[in-house]
């Protein structure tokens, strides 16, 4: 398993391996919920392909409050439409911002 900062940018749903990064998830939780703007109770919501008990890569996380995290898992397409979100684009934006932060550190 590789650390998130070492990953080259890729389209969100084509990540070849599962990446785990607690610092990245902690950073994601520092943002407001993308759906409602809440600042508290933010979770790093995994997006992208997953099945059974396996989560998608941490690099595919977005910040959502508990309520909207649960709603997203009930139907991603409907969720994106309802809140006018482009989840793959949000993931790419967050990944790019994280890489820039890591370069500056």
Model-derived features with residue positions:
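Short linker/helix segments within small regulatory modules
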Residues: 48-61, 82
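Compositionally biased, intrinsically disordered low-complexity regions
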Residues: 39, 50-53, 77
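Histidine-centered catalytic micro-motifs
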Residues: 42-50, 65-71
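A boundary/linker detector
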Residues: 1-25, 30-32, 37-43, 59, ...
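Short Cys/His-centered divalent metal-binding micro-motifs
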Residues: 62-82
